[in-house]
A protein has these predicted regions:
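Short amphipathic alpha-helices and their capping/turn segments at secondary-structure boundaries
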Residues: 1, 27-40, 147-157
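Residue-level signal for the start and early helices of compact helical domains
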Residues: 3, 74, 127, 150-153
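Hydrophobic residues within beta-strands of alpha/beta enzymes
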Residues: 3-5, 42-43, 162
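Membrane-targeting and insertion segments and their boundary/processing signals
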Residues: 4, 8, 94-97
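Active-site beta-loop-alpha junctions enriched in small/polar residues
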Residues: 5-10, 47-49, 107-111, 137-143, ...
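Active-site acidic/histidine proton-transfer and metal-coordination neighborhood
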Residues: 13-134
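Gly/Pro-rich active-site loop or hairpin
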Residues: 113, 117-121, 140-171
Length: 171
């Protein structure tokens, strides 16, 4: 069996509804595939901040600080509207995962809203889904200046999946 099935769908966090819906549809397919392969969960990067990326830029699993320095937020972005829509989409994603008996793991990475345990815990508190979990990626969290010991303590029962890596948080 596959321990975790990885989906990388930053469009779930898109402020553009049609992009987000397409990503949610793909996420549901990812849940179906994960369950088929016997995974205990699906993993995605945490919701990406709604930056405006160049249209011809490919999707990356990790965005470098150099890339993020050269993008900006949409001029007319309303944080409240964006946050409410994001919570609705994340709620749907958690439900899809639960429907397939899967945990939904948030992967911390530069540029996401869950790049630290605090970001994840805020999202978890807002959503309340028991199957929403955090991928404790030691390298990425170290890169984000997370106190690893404190992060482990804060996660408590949400500590379910640890990725021990040595990539300086950049791969």
């Amino acid at each position: 069996a596959l321990p975790v099935f990885c989906t990388v769908l930053p469009g779930i966090a898109s402020p553009q509804g049609e992009i987000a819906q397409k990503s949610l549809d793909l996420f549901k397919t990812g849940c179906e595939l994960g369950a088929y392969f016997g995974a205990r969960g699906v993993l995605d990067n945490g919701p990406l901040v709604p930056y405006e990326f160049p249209a011809d830029m490919p999707i990356h699993r990790h965005y470098s600080p150099d890339v993020l320095r050269n993008v900006r937020l949409p001029q007319r972005l309303s944080w409240k509207v964006y946050w409410d829509n994001l919570l609705s989409r994340m709620d749907t994603a958690c439900k899809f995962a639960a429907d397939y008996g899967l945990n939904y793991y948030m992967h911390p990475c530069v540029g996401s809203l869950t790049d630290t345990t605090n970001g994840y815990l805020l999202l978890k508190e807002e959503l309340g889904w028991e199957n929403l979990k955090f991928n404790f990626d030691t390298s990425n969290l170290y890169y984000m200046h997370e106190n690893l010991s404190l992060g482990l303590l804060k996660l408590g029962k949400d500590l379910d999946y640890i990725h021990i890596s040595d990539s300086y948080g950049q791969r």
